[in-house]
Amino acid sequence: LSGSSSERFSPVRHLPLSVWLTAPEGQSLATCANGCCMPVTGPLARQLITTCTRADGLVVDVHPADHALVANAVALSRRVSTVVIDPAVAGVIWTRATTGRDEADRRRVDVRIARAEATYLALAHRRGEAALVVVRRTCESEPNVTTIDGSLQELAEPAALLAPGGHLVVVTGLHLIQGRPHDPVPGLIRAAQRAGLVYLQHIVAVYGPIRRRQIVSSLLPAQSALSKAQAVSPYVPTALRAHADLLIFTKPHRPPASAGICPCGEEEA
């Protein structure tokens, strides 16, 4: 996803790490506690869509908090399916994605409402079709179900939506669970590999503008001020949510020769 093809797929120990500047374009983002919010901003949505898909490709957004990914997918001539739990959120997404669009564009948009446990039943008609699937793994969306070995809930369901060559993007980041720091990245990598996916890249999506080679913390999204004010664990310093971590996986055209073996170096440590 960055650099030459030989750089991306050469059998080296450390995967490429890229930084994307994704500061929101003036919109006010939702507030939440403990640094949970890791929004897909407009610039981030466009970067993901143009990097991972082509015109008329299918984008699937699972449990979005807002319209950013869906609306940008339509604007970039992609088809898009999304499932949300809250009917009010579904209404906002539909309105923002279709207002001012012609009938052909509106037919590209599929917004469904379903209970959390029925999410992938609502998306069953998209299995094997998606060029890009985006899911979130934040402290508010941390799965309640674990596998036999106690690891994070499998990513098999979102992986099943992918067409061969399609990409799964997991939006996550270090956060607090019950007052303790939690890094979900190693468990997510293992879960994706069990689902038959190949780990491509780690993207750091920076939410604040950069000035003089530094993130301007005073201009971070609205949830930063709230997260700074929260009582936090003594194990980590008080911090602003300056970025999210994006883990990008792909569904190979044939099963990986060494599924379950992580080529990601330090991220498995």
Question: Whereabouts are the PLM-identified features?
Answer:
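Class I S-adenosyl-L-methionine-dependent methyltransferase catalytic core
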Residues: L1-A269
